[in-house]
A protein has these predicted regions:
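Extended redox/cofactor-interaction regions of prokaryotic respiratory oxidoreductases
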Residues: 81-190, 200-210, 218, 278-376
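Flexible glycine/proline-enriched surface loops and loop-helix/loop-strand junctions
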Residues: 29-32, 61-66, 219-228
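Glycine-rich phosphate/diphosphate-binding loops that line cofactor/substrate pockets in enzymes
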Residues: 25, 46-59, 137-149
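Glycine/threonine-rich phosphate-binding loop and adjacent beta-strand/alpha-helix elements that clamp
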Residues: 202-229, 239, 244
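A glycine-rich phosphate-binding loop feature that marks nucleotide/adenosyl-phosphate handling sites
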Residues: 16, 51-52, 95-106, 255-270, ...
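Conserved short loop/turn motifs at secondary-structure junctions
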Residues: 36-40, 63-70, 102, 155-159
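Long, contiguous, secondary-structure-rich segments that constitute the structural scaffold
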Residues: 224-279, 351-367, 371-462
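Long, well-ordered, tryptophan-enriched scaffold segments
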Residues: 1-55
Length: 462
């Protein structure tokens, strides 16, 4: 973009800072320089950039897979930089932002929400009072002041969803006490001393606070429960509030605040001044209009400007450059790079317990390019052994020409064959967990986030 004078900030020109700094920072990453590591010819990279710049509207877009690897933060930053530099941010046809009826974004008095404190064992940075999940097992297993001795989980399954799941499994066994708010006895909740099953599904009301913020149009929709909850059942919000009440040591009578009260207040004080009753009178929701340009008003920087080149991220570019040089040397012991995938019908582990969603051909396979498979003398659907630094699993190989040579791929959320799991449907499709191969020591060094992709592995026929 810089080489072809393609910078077109458009309406963002007056409040975007750091363009020249950005130009200098990426000068070493020319199409010719990155062609080998990306596997994309320099001419093709140039064509993509030219097409992007020439398009009337365009969006560069990345989601979970981009985020959960060793340079996730850097990648998401550069995606935004590309959209901003080409005039595709806060403009029709480009990346735009919602004006939700229930606002969850606020200007903070203290904008510093990163690395205010660190994890006890490895010193990983916090973000918004949360620690990277890669630190979870070690914080339970490592003795000393501040060791985690008790745990509450809520509708989560870290044994299958965090790196080095076997270590996580072992860590949960060492807890003094564990409570799970869940409707399933799964790979994680089987360790709990107490399981508190909340009312769920069609027994609950719903207002999607998160996805109204991420929508392609401004809308608001409330869904009341279709059925009353069963006798003596509690909603999850009742359980959370009562637990918090008791943790505080309060003994007075306690009456939980229903989410409808919070929602109604937020709607009435929001930009549209609607209320919950209006939503209840509109069962299909209320259309609040198309997305509109909202910069600089919607920016949360203190000076209401886009800071294109923060120093923290510029420094991480140097790490990327060093990694790029090092990655040219292939590992002899672990020559293949493992990445993850999610299928539309089973993208989370709990969906495997639905017969309608899990039915069909086996999706827990190792995707591998046929040329790599032939080198390893692996037939299509042959069982293979995959080994990383932390573990070994066995599963069928599936030839796939969409895979890049040297890269293999496994799905998320399987591994239901562990003892005492009470998921009748899922156990019939147990598969193996990709997170028994992922490594809690592999991180996005900038944030400490787990790197679930680009895990180096060895593959052999069984």
């Amino acid at each position: 973009v810089f080489a072809e004078n393609g910078v077109q900030l458009g309406n963002n020109n007056a409040f975007t800072e750091g363009v020249d700094t950005m130009k200098a920072a990426v000068s070493d990453f020319s199409p010719e320089a990155v062609a080998e590591i990306t596997g994309i010819a320099a001419s093709e990279i140039q064509r993509l950039a030219q097409d992007f710049m020439a398009a009337k509207t365009a969006i560069c877009y990345g989601r979970v897979g981009v985020s959960t690897q060793g340079f996730g933060t850097l990648s998401q930053w550069l995606i935004n930089v590309l959209n901003i530099l080409t005039g595709n941010c806060d403009s029709v046809g480009g990346v735009m932002f919602t004006a939700p009826a229930f606002e969850i974004l606020r200007q903070r008095k203290d904008p510093n929400i990163f690395n205010r404190w660190q994890s006890r064992v490895r010193g990983l940075p916090e973000f918004m009072s949360e620690l990277p999940v890669a630190a979870m097992a070690e914080e339970i297993l490592t003795e000393g002041q501040g060791q985690i001795r008790a745990l509450i989980t809520s509708c989560g399954n870290p044994v299958l969803s965090v790196p080095n799941g076997q270590k996580m499994d072992a860590a949960l066994e060492k807890l003094d006490f564990m409570v799970s708010i869940d409707i399933y006895i799964n790979e994680t909740t089987r360790h709990a001393n107490i399981i508190l099953p909340p009312a769920t599904g069609l027994e609950t009301s719903h207002y999607d606070i998160t996805f109204h913020v991420l929508a392609i149009r401004n809308t608001a929709k409330y869904s009341p429960p279709l059925f009353p909850k069963s006798e003596n059942a509690k909603y999850d919000w009742e359980i959370f509030q009562e637990l918090a009440h008791h943790f505080k040591g309060e003994t007075a009578d306690f009456k939980p605040v229903p989410p409808e009260a919070i929602l109604n207040h937020g709607l009435k004080t929001g930009r549209y001044s609607i209320d919950l009753q209006q939503l209840m009178n509109a069962p299909h929701g209320i259309d609040l209009g198309a997305l509109e340009s909202c910069f600089p008003a919607r920016l949360f920087t203190a000076d209401k400007k886009i800071q294109l080149a923060p120093e923290l991220l510029l420094q991480d570019l140097k790490r990327a450059h060093a990694f790029w040089q090092q990655s040219k040397q292939q590992s002899i012991d672990f020559p293949y790079a493992l990445i993850g995938r999610r299928h539309l019908r089973d993208n989370n582990s709990w969906l495997h317990n639905s017969e309608r969603l899990i039915k069909g051909r086996n999706r827990c396979t190792l995707l591998i390019h046929p040329v790599d498979a032939n080198v390893l003398k692996i037939d299509n659907q042959q069982v293979v052994k995959v080994t990383s630094r932390v573990g070994t699993v066995e599963l069928p190989a599936e030839w796939c020409t969409d895979m890049m040579r040297g890269v293999v791929c496994m799905p998320h959320g399987y591994g239901h064959g562990r003892a005492n799991v009470q998921l009748d449907v899922a156990r019939k499709h147990a598969g193996v967990s990709v997170n028994d191969l992922t490594d809690e020591q592999l991180l996005d060094d900038l944030t400490g986030n787990a790197a679930f992709s680009n895990v180096l592995v060895h593959i052999a026929a069984v």
